[in-house]
Amino acid sequence: MMAFKLKIVTPDGLIYDGEAEKLIVRTSGGDVCILARHMDYVAPLGMGMAIVEANGKRRTAACIGGMLSVSGGECTLVPTTFEWSDKIDLSRAEASYDRAHKVLNSGSASDTEIALAQARLHRALVRKSVVSFK
């Protein structure tokens, strides 16, 4: 399979800079698969799993927010948060899920607290699903 240049940059710095055969990410419009020679494309990222296939190996990550750009045969992913599955602390994700669930079930949370808890819950679910993905 042909490769393309992929760069993943977060506010914390450069995560990946190299060749890839395939990138699958969740955009605000749904999942998209980028392969070599993809047409120029820009999309806001949603919250979900990213799959990077490079050198015949597949790596998964939690990819949350940001932008995806494909231009001139090169792909740049600029997520707000990007965590490789082997770097995700499952117990921390489960604790975050439990805290968010508690707020949502309290019956006394404000609209703002509910919105924040829903976002926290979704992020925790993404992290948990990435870790358990086979």
What residues fall within each predicted segment?
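N-terminal export/targeting signal detector
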Residues: 1-5, 9, 133
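Compact, glycine-rich, soluble single-domain proteins
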Residues: 7-99
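Acidic/glycine-rich phosphate/pyrophosphate-binding loops and surrounding catalytic core
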Residues: 84-134
